[in-house]
C-alpha cells in the first residue's frame, strides 16, 4: 500500500512538473542564457567608493523605470495581467509585450510594436510628422503626443519623467559629495543638470575628462535604435562599470592612431573625412549593472559615446569594452556556435582574443567615416532617417574587422591571433547574431552583411551542412561593403539606403537550417543577467 502511495506521489509530482514546464514561452526564455554578474573584487576601492557604486545603482534603477514608461508604458499593469511565469519573464526580458527580434506581440490584447515604439502616437505617420511645423520635433529628447483635439505636441523628456529625474539627480549629487575624485564630482553634477535640461554637451565633455576613476557610470538617453520610424528619439539606459586598468593601458596605445585608422578604411577620401578630437580613449571594464535600454533584449558588449558630433569633433569619443560580458557571449554563443556552424578546419580558427579585438575595433569604427554629409544635407543621421542606425551598424561591424585585419598586416597583434582567426570568429558571431532578427537595427545589419558576403561567395556551404570560408573573398567583400556604406552616409543617399536595406535585410534560405543546428545544440541567441545584490 505504501509503495502504491509512493508511486502515486511520484506520478503526481511528475504531472505537476510536466504542467509547470509546458509553457510555450519556455523555449523563448531559454534563448537567453542566464549569466551571473558576480559581486566584483572591490579590494582596491575605498568605503566612499563603494557607497558611490551603490548610489550609481540606485540612479540606474530610476533609469530602468523611465525606460519602461518610454518604450512601452505601464510595466506593472502589463506584468500583473500575465499569469504564465515564463511569459512574464519573457516580457521582462523584452521590456514590454513585443519580441524584440520580430517586433511581434506575444501578449493577448496588444498589437505589434509600432515602428516608433512609445516615442510617438501609434497612429502617426512619417508624412504627418514631416508636415508638422514644430521647432522641437527633431530633438532626440522630446516625445510626440496627441492633444485632445487630435493635433501633435512635443513633451521634453525632463518634463515627462521629472519625478524619476529628480531622484536620479539626488543620487548623483550625493555621489558627488562623497567621491574623492574632482573629475568624478564634476561629471556627476554636470550630468544631474543635463538630465534636468536635456542639454548634454557639457556633461559629455566632463565625462570624457573623467579618465582617472576606477568606476564609471554611463547614464541618460543615448541611442536611437528603438525609434524605427524616424531614427531620432533616444532611449534611456545606464551602465555601472569597474575599470580593468591593465587591459585599458594595453588598448590606449591605439588611440593616437585614430587618423591612421581613418585612412585605412576603403573608399574615396571624401567619404572618410571626420577627424575626432584628440581626447579619445578606450577603456576595458567589467559591467556591474545594466538598466533601461541596455538591459532590454539583446545585450551590448561595447559602447562608443557620446553620439554628439560636435563633442566628437572637439574632444573625441570613449570606447568601452565590457570585458566580462564579451567573455560571456563568446563562451555561451560565439565559440560553441562556431563549432556547430563551421567545418572543423575553419572552426579551429575560433578565438576569444579575436572576438575581443573585433569588438574593440567595431566600436572604434563608430567614430570614423563621416558625421556630416558632403553635399549639404546635414548630419548623416538626419539625411538617412530611419535607415541611419542600420547603416551605421553595418559600417561599424565591417570596418571594425577590416581594421583588425590591417593590424594583423602590420604585425601589431599577430602574436595574439591570426587574420584568419579574426575573420572566422567574425563569421561565427555574424551567423549567431542573425537570430537577433529583422525586428532590430542590429539584427538587420547582421543579415545585410551575411547576404552581401554570401553573394560574393565568401562562405560556401558543404555537404556536412557546415560552412567553409574563403578568407580572401570575405575580406574583399567586407572592404567593398564598407566603402559602399561610407559613400551612402557621406552623400546622404536615403533612397539608396532604403532600397539597399530592403534588398539585403531578408533572412536567407540558410537561416532556418542554421537556427535549427544551433537550437539542437542548445546554443542560445543571447544572454540575460542575474545581478549580485
Language-model segments: residues:
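N-terminal helix-rich structural modules
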Residues: 22-188
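C-terminal motif of bacterial Sec signal peptides marking the signal peptidase cleavage site
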Residues: 14-17
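Active-site recognition of the HExxH zinc-binding catalytic motif
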Residues: 46, 354-371, 396, 401
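An active-site-proximal "capping" alpha-helix that borders the catalytic cofactor pocket
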Residues: 181, 389-407
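Long, well-structured alpha-helical subdomains associated
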Residues: 401-499
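Extended, compositionally biased alpha-helical segments that mediate assembly or anchoring
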Residues: 485-533
